[in-house]
Regions:
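Metallocofactor- and cofactor-centric catalytic cores in central/energy metabolism, strongly enriched
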Residues: 1-268
């Protein structure tokens, strides 16, 4: 199964869009989002409490003092960073494009939930969080180059670490497409994935193998800043669906009503 169905047709649409939007720093309604009709699927063959889980974020995290992502690249920056999960969040910076970094600068867990996932490891919700996570700047309009150049290298690194499942967290609308395509490539390589989502249309078009959707905000996809319980609930429900899913699809996370009640009570 192709990561981008009818990729040559998509290239033509993208080339036409590029010709008309050479200086565009953001997307408009004419951008040719990838339209897939089917999804690859790899079932999880072990329980959450026994697996090595990888985190993939498209919020543009990089280590302070190292090279940033190129947020001016017309087709997007096709590189990724491999970062130790034990890093102090204060040592990270975010090259934000396509989303407001205010929330992630307030609480990195809203896009990079290392603290929450390490809690899950301690509580044996997951076997372990992989010792490295992967960071992209997910504003990548050139989807064809992404799947041909970036995704194979990312899959190679996941296999090197013997990752058994991957959680993908987008930051912007275009990030939803970027990580949906990455998830398709990872799943084709035999590694189950789960993608969080707050933009329904993007995942309906790109067809990631599994997506947990709720009506959240770009730049705060794992939950509201400084509200650990909200973040835990979103992650817990999404991850447990990896275990139970028997076919590809999108699942609406039942986190909104409970969160509204908690907020009204001041339980944050």
């Amino acid at each position: 199964m192709e990561i981008i169905e009818q990729i040559e047709e998509w290239r033509k649409r993208y080339s036409n869009w590029q010709t008309q939007h050479r200086s565009a720093s953001e997307l408009d309604k004419s951008y040719p989002f990838v339209e897939n009709t089917r999804s690859p699927f790899t079932p999880l063959r072990r329980s959450l409490s026994m697996l090595n889980l990888a985190l993939i974020s498209s919020a543009g995290a990089y280590i302070d003092g190292t090279e940033s992502f190129d947020t001016d690249a017309p087709g997007g920056d096709l590189t990724f960073r491999e970062i130790p999960t034990g890093i102090d969040p204060s040592d990270l910076l975010f090259a934000a494009r396509g989303y407001d970094p205010a929330f992630v600068n307030e609480d990195a867990n809203v896009q990079l939930p290392l603290a929450r996932l390490l809690e899950f490891e301690s509580n044996r919700v997951i076997g372990q969080l992989n010792s490295a996570f992967w960071s992209l700047c997910g504003f990548i309009p050139d989807a064809a180059s992404l799947v041909e150049l970036t995704v194979p290298k990312l899959v190679e690194r996941l296999k090197h670490y013997e990752v058994q499942a991957a959680l993908l967290v987008p930051a912007s609308r275009l990030c939803h497409q970027t990580l949906a395509l990455a998830a398709r490539g990872i799943e084709q390589a035999g590694i189950p994935t789960m993608m969080l989502a707050v933009e329904r249309e993007a995942i309906d078009l790109a067809h990631p193998p599994r997506a947990g959707f709720y009506r959240g905000q770009f730049g705060s996809v794992v939950g509201r800043p400084n509200w650990p319980e909200h973040q835990r609930r979103i992650l817990d429900e999404a991850l447990r669906w990896i275990e139970s899913a028997s076919q590809p699809g999108n699942n609406k996370l039942a986190v909104e009503l409970e969160s509204q009640v908690e907020a009204a009570r001041g339980e944050r």
